[in-house]
Amino acid sequence: MTATAPVAQPKMSHREIMQSLTGLLMGMFVSILAGTVVSSSLPVIVSDLDGGQTAFTWVVTATLLATTISTPIWGKLADLGNRKLLLQLALAMFVLASAAAGFAQNTEFLIAMRVIQGLAGGGMGALSQIVMADILSPRERGKYMGLFGAVMAVGTVGGPLIGGFITDTINWRWNFFVALPFAVVAILLIQRTLHLPAFAKRKVKIDYLGIMLLSSGVALLLIWMSMGGSQFGWNSTTSYLMAGGSVVLLALFVLTEFKAAEPLLNLGLFKNRTFTFAVIASLAIGVSMFGTSVFLSQYMIMARGATATQAGLMTFPMMAGLLVISTIAGALITRFGKWKAFVVTGSILQVVGLFLLGTIHYDTNFVLVGVYMFILGAGVGLVMQNMVLVVQNAVPVNELGVASSAVNFFRTLGGTAGTAGLGALLAINIPNMIADRQSDLAKAMATLGDKAAEVSAQLASGSLPSISTLPEPVRVIFESVYGDGVAALFAVAAPISLITVVAVCLLPNQKLRTQTAVERHQEGEGQAPASAPAVDGAKGLEAQRAEGTLLTEAPATADGDNEKKPGSPAGA
C-alpha cells in the first residue's frame, strides 16, 4: 500500500466547511442511529425471522464487536491514505449493508449485515472526527460542540422511538432503510464540498499481524464480557479460557507493535502525557456513558413500569444535559481558548450525578431523578468530546488518526466492560434482594386469592417477570427491589468515575492550536520525506526522536500552555 505526503490545495471557504461539516455530522448520526433504531424492535425482528435467544444476543453483539475492532484500524488507515475516500467508503458500506439487512430472510444473514454495518459505523465515527480536525482548528471546534451533542441526543434518544414507531405502524424492515437518505446525502455533500490536500505517494507496510492479533484479542474479550453470566458462568472453564486467551493475544499484539514498521498503534504515543491520561479518562467515561444509559432504561422499565418507548423518553434529561451544557461550554472554549476548567468540572459533575442516582428508589420523585440525570449528562458532555479535542491538539499530526480513534476505542471498551460488570453485579444482587423480601412477598400473595397460583407460576418460571402485568401488591415489591438494585450500580460506578477526575486533573494544560491539521501537514510537521524508507518499530521511534518528528509532549510555557508555532494565525 502507499501512504502520502500533502500537496497544498486552496483553502476551503466557510460555506464549504459548513456543508462538509453537515455531511460529517450526518455520517455520525447514521452510525449512532444504526445501533439504536433497532433496539426497541429487536424482539419482533428476531421472532419474525424465527431466531432464538442466541440470535437475539448476536444481532447486538456482532455490531458492537465490529465497531470496536474496526475503530483503530480506520484510524491508522486515515494516517496512511486518502481520508475523504475512506469516509465515503465507510458510508457506502453502510448504505449497502443497511439495504441488504432490510431484506434479510434469516437471522444468520441479518447478523452478517450487522457486522458490515458495525465495520462501517466504526469508520464513520472515527473518520468524522479526524476529518473535522483537518478542516477546523482545535480552538475553533469548540463552538460546534453543540452540534455533536444534538446529533448524539437525537440519535441515542430518538433512535428507539423512531424504531418502535416504524415497527408498530409500517414494518420492522424499514428500520434499516430509515437512515439511508441521510447516508446518501452525506456522501454527496462530502464529495462536493470536502477538499483535502492531494498526497504524494510513498511505500508503507500494513501491520497485518497487529490487525489480526488486536481483532482476535478484543473480539474474545468483548464476547467474554457480553456473554459471561448468561451464556456461561463467570467461574466456568469457558470463561477462564476466553479471558486468558484474550490476555495472551493482546500481549502478543503489544510485542508485535514494538517491531512493526508501521504499527497499528504507535506505543510511543503513551509517552505523551495528554494521550495517556485521555485514554485512562475515556475508559472510565465509557462506564458513565454506556453503562448508565443501559441501566437507566432498565430502572424506568422495571422500577417505574414504563414501556420501552417511554423509557427512552424518560432518559431524555441526561441527553438534554449533554446537549445544553456542551453547547455553552464549547462556545466559551472557542472564545477564551481555555478548556481544562470545563473538563475538570465535567468530571466532578459525573461523580456527583452518579452518586445522586445511587440514592434513588422506585418511588423517588421523577423531577429529582430528572435533575440527577441532567447533572450526569452535563458532566459527560463536558468531558467526552473534549478528550478527543485535547488529544488531537497534542499529538503529532501524522499520528492524529491513530490517536483520535484510540480515544474512541478505549471509551467503547470501557463502556462494554462497565456494562458487563455492572450487569453481572445486578444479576447477583436481585435474587438476594428478592430472597430478603420473601416474607413481604408471601403476605402480598395471600391477598391475591385465585390469582396467587398463576402469579407464583410466572415468578417460578425463571424468566424476567413483566413487572407492569403483576398485581399491585406484588408489583410494588419487585419495583422496589429493582429500583434499589439499579441504584446500587450507580453507587458502584461513582467511585470508578473518580478515575476520570484524577486523569483529567493530570492532563497538561496546553493551549489550543489555531491551525487545522491540513495547515500543520502543509508546514511539514511530523512528515518524513516521501522517499524515506520504512524503519523497524523500536529503532524507528529513536530515529523519529532524533529527527524531531516524534512529539512526546507539546512544547510548554511556564504556565503549562504550549507555545504557538511560528507563523500560526492569531486569534480563534
Regions found by a protein language model. Give the residues of each.
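Transmembrane-helix exit segments and adjacent C-terminal regions of multi-pass membrane proteins
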Residues: M1-L24, T274, V455-A572
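Flexible interhelical linker loops that connect adjacent transmembrane helices
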Residues: V7-K11, R139, I187-S215, S230, ...
